[in-house]
Amino acid sequence: MLRLLLALNFFPSIQVAENKILVKQSPMLVVNDNEVNLSCKYTYNLFSKEFRASLYKGADSAVEVCAVNGNHSHPLQSTNKEFNCTVKVGNETVTFYLQDLYVNQTDIYFCKLEVLYPPPYIDNEKSNGTIIHVKEKHLCPSPRSPESSKPFWALVVVNGVLVFYSLLVTVALSNCWMKNKRNRMLQSDYMNMTPRRPGPTRRHYQPYAPARDFAAYRS
């Protein structure tokens, strides 16, 4: 689309009639910060004249961006709701200040001037126009100011203190647990080493044998 607009912009202009006003516009304006100033320079002095100066968008000038009516001292402005536009009028120059432009508003723009009083009615011959190329804005992270970094460092310090306190509590609980475990083991060993009272012993009886009668052997 941009190439087509460039081709339209550089077509040779048609020969201007005697009752037409010439207008000079920049061939192309590149917008990087969503705002641009478009100056329309005319070969006609607007001082003490009743006029209407307007800016149109599109190759067929289908959309009126903004316009100013009246005279040099008391201009009345009207603006399309889709644009943020203000107008400044000079003796031979009308400047349109466009702000908050979007990428989809890239197009060719035409200046138009109509002299309403005194007669006769005169307007400008259509110029080659100005291509306004709106680039997409990429926001870069701004460096942090010292004031904005204070809450961040305060949060870091608080978190550090909490982590250190948690570590101390964990170490203390671990030491207590180890000491309790060691004490239980020592008590268990002491109980195992306590002398026990011997139980009743079994008596071993010799098997009974009848007593021998030695007197019988003697006789």
Swiss-Prot record:
Q: Which residues form the signal peptide?
A: 1-18
**GO CC annotations, alphabetized:** external side of plasma membrane
For side Extracellular, which residue ranges?
A: 19-151
- TM spans (from-to): 152-178
Where are the Phosphoserine modifications? S188
The alphabetized list of GO BP terms reads: immune response; positive regulation of interleukin-10 production; positive regulation of interleukin-2 production; positive regulation of interleukin-4 production; positive regulation of mitotic nuclear division; positive regulation of T cell proliferation; T cell activation; T cell costimulation
Which positions carry Phosphotyrosine? Y190, Y208
For the Ig-like V-type domain, which residue ranges apply? 28-136
Per the UniProt topology annotation, the Cytoplasmic ranges are 179-219
What is the topology of this protein in the membrane according to its UniProt annotation?
Single-pass type I membrane protein
Q: Which InterPro entries match?
A: CD28 (IPR008093), CTLA4/CD28 (IPR040216), Ig-like_dom_sf (IPR036179), Ig-like_fold (IPR013783), Ig_V-set (IPR013106)
Disulfide bond entries: C40-C111, C66-C85
Sites where a glycan is attached: N37, N71, N84, N91, N104, N128
What post-translational modification information does the record give?
Phosphorylated by LCK. Dephosphorylated by PTPN11.
Q: What does the UniProt entry say about where the protein is found? A: Cell membrane
Q: Assembly and interactions?
A: Homodimer; disulfide-linked. Interacts with DUSP14. Binds to CD80/B7-1 and CD86/B7-2/B70. Interacts with GRB2. Interacts with PIK3R1. Interacts with PRKCQ.
Q: What does this protein do?
A: Receptor that plays a role in T-cell activation, proliferation, survival and the maintenance of immune homeostasis. Functions not only as an amplifier of TCR signals but delivers unique signals that control intracellular biochemical events that alter the gene expression program of T-cells. Stimulation upon engagement of its cognate ligands CD80 or CD86 increases proliferation and expression of various cytokines in particular IL2 production in both CD4(+) and CD8(+) T-cell subsets.
The name of this protein is T-cell-specific surface glycoprotein CD28
Originating species: Bos taurus (Bovine)
Organism lineage string: Eukaryota, Metazoa, Chordata, Craniata, Vertebrata
Q: Which gene encodes it?
A: CD28
